[in-house]
Amino acid sequence: MLRICLFLVAFCHVVVSDVVQLQKMYGRIASPDFPNVYPNSKERTWNITMPQGYTIRIYFTHFNLELSYQCEYDYVKMQSGGEVLATLCGHESTDTEEAPGDKTFHSLDNNLAVTFRSDYSNEKGFTGFEAFYSAEDIDECQQRIDNEPICDHYCHNYLGGFYCSCHIGYVLHKNKRTCTA
């Protein structure tokens, strides 16, 4: 029994994780202990949520993570709309790994999950990341339904939404998109 316990202590590395909920229209996120060296065996997820009618724009001002093949050790992963937008690691992109550089990322909807994960061996003093996010208004008037404009006649976009209107002599239907004479 003692051998099993020693084996578990020696070879099992527990990753400590936590989740942060963010609902402000803009903000800053950073790896734990930034700008100092980030800790080993840490996972933190920031769930960023905006009101309907907005997406989320995020860019990195500092990025210095351990480089590993396909970012399997330390990484920042961004997910939105059920899809992985990017998995980032290292300092510069290679043929199999991506670092953010000057790239700006956009969520697919009003939610963005950003997960930072470190393994058990940050031996070279990597300092992690700093990123800034903000809400971006969706221009619903540019969207299409079945390849048709969202409004029959006029579409009016405003922060967080839109409305349709009709030419003089036409009436807007209950669906608030279709116009008839």
Model-predicted regions and their roles:
Residues 2-181:
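Domain-level representation of secreted and single-pass membrane ectodomains enriched
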